[in-house]
Amino acid sequence: MNTSRLFSLFFQGNLVKRIFIGLILGLLVALVTPTLQNVLGFNLAEKVGVLGTIFVRSLRAVAPILIFVLVMAAIANKKIGAKSNMKSIIVLYLLGTFLAALSAVIAGFLFPSEVALATKEDMTSAPQGVGQVLLTLVFNVVDNPLNALFKANFVGVLAWSIGLGLALRHASESTKTMVSDLAEAVSKIVYVIIAFAPIGVFGLVSETLADKGLVALGGYIHLLAVLVGTMLFVAFVVNPILVYWKIRRNPYPLVWTCVRESGLTAFFTRSSAANIPVNINLAKRLNLDEETYSVSIPLGATINMAGAAITVTILTLAAVHTLDIQISFFSALLLSVVASICACGASGVAGGSLLLIPLACSLFGVSDDVAAQMIGVGFIIGILQDSTETALNSSTDVLFTAAACIAEENKQV
């Protein structure tokens, strides 16, 4: 009975609660390891740390193929409405995502974060400036597609997935359906791996804290504060500026309504897709154009990913600072562009934004092993980070839709 209850605790129910339990158990193991080592004759934290290593290797294995099929399927099957103000909404979505990534770059430089990693590699090939980063980017783009998958060249994987996705837009419906089914199949594998996240976090926390000490928690707390702080800045400073640009009046009543009615629900559901009915209901109560919001809100749940762009950017810069890689601000600016593109592929996948971190890390020569460890760090702080990210993403969907609709009404008056 006890074994059955323990199994249910780790593999069923709310993922956030299970990760929190894994975090607490990992902390306890790290605390008791020095005492038990003399009794047991081995390092308990080191032994359970293998669980974290297996989890990280699983993430490394699935990330390249996930990005490849997900982006390809999304582009091949994308249908954008013909409404005149849809273009305005899409511009807001993409501009908002880019400005969120740019805000994250600035925050990453102003408040640099470092976290404890299992390995700190000697990064002798660290990029010297934006020129070298761009040259590396071009070389990675023209890589052989199979080699890109085998070597985890995420930029090459992204380039080929975009190219094939655009080509497949003209394919038959049966071919598009097959591509979508393939993406769904890979996503299901990801869900299985994510189900083991509590055990992975348990192993990672145990080994990290036993090795680095409780001081390692300070790095996690600082990183989380930078992430959440940047998301709040985007929600209450950047987004209102964009809304004012469209409607030319005080944006905060509308911003607050969207955060209260949509963001709060999304914070607890942790799913932009699950929050679509909430956003549609809010759009209806705001008397927005139904033909517009019925298309723009589901589309926003797919491509409007400001929170994901912030997560990818901040965690990538944390890896860069941890490894003491010197990069220019313009190189980091390129990161914000890549993070914006990456974020559009994060929708509908468990831990989607975290699984795109290796792609961004590859810009600066960070190994896929270290990048995978940053994914693990993301899961550790994900108890709060993921909820805040989803709240920002989902509330922005209805906010930008409302701004575009109001701007359209103002033109007609």
UniProtKB/Swiss-Prot annotation:
Q: Where in the cell is it found?
A: Cell inner membrane
Molecular functions per Gene Ontology: neutral L-amino acid:sodium symporter activity
What the entry lists under Gene3D superfamilies is as follows: Sodium:dicarboxylate symporter
Q: Which residues cross the membrane?
A: 19-39, 61-81, 89-109, 148-168, 189-209, 223-243, 297-317, 325-345
User: What is the catalytic activity of this protein?
Assistant: L-serine(in) + Na(+)(in) = L-serine(out) + Na(+)(out); L-threonine(in) + Na(+)(in) = L-threonine(out) + Na(+)(out)
Record-level GO cellular component terms:
plasma membrane
Keyword Phosphoprotein in record: no
Membrane topology (UniProt): Multi-pass membrane protein
Q: Which GO terms describe its biological process?
A: serine transport; threonine transport
Query: In UniProt terms, what function does this protein have?
Result: Involved in the import of serine and threonine into the cell, with the concomitant import of sodium (symport system).
What the entry lists under PANTHER family is as follows: PROTON/GLUTAMATE-ASPARTATE SYMPORTER, SERINE_THREONINE TRANSPORTER SSTT
Q: Which HAMAP family match?
A: Ser_Thr_transp_SstT
Q: Which family does it belong to?
A: Belongs to the dicarboxylate/amino acid:cation symporter (DAACS) (TC 2.A.23) family.
Query: What name is this protein filed under?
Result: Serine/threonine transporter SstT
User: From what organism does this protein derive?
Assistant: Pasteurella multocida (strain Pm70)
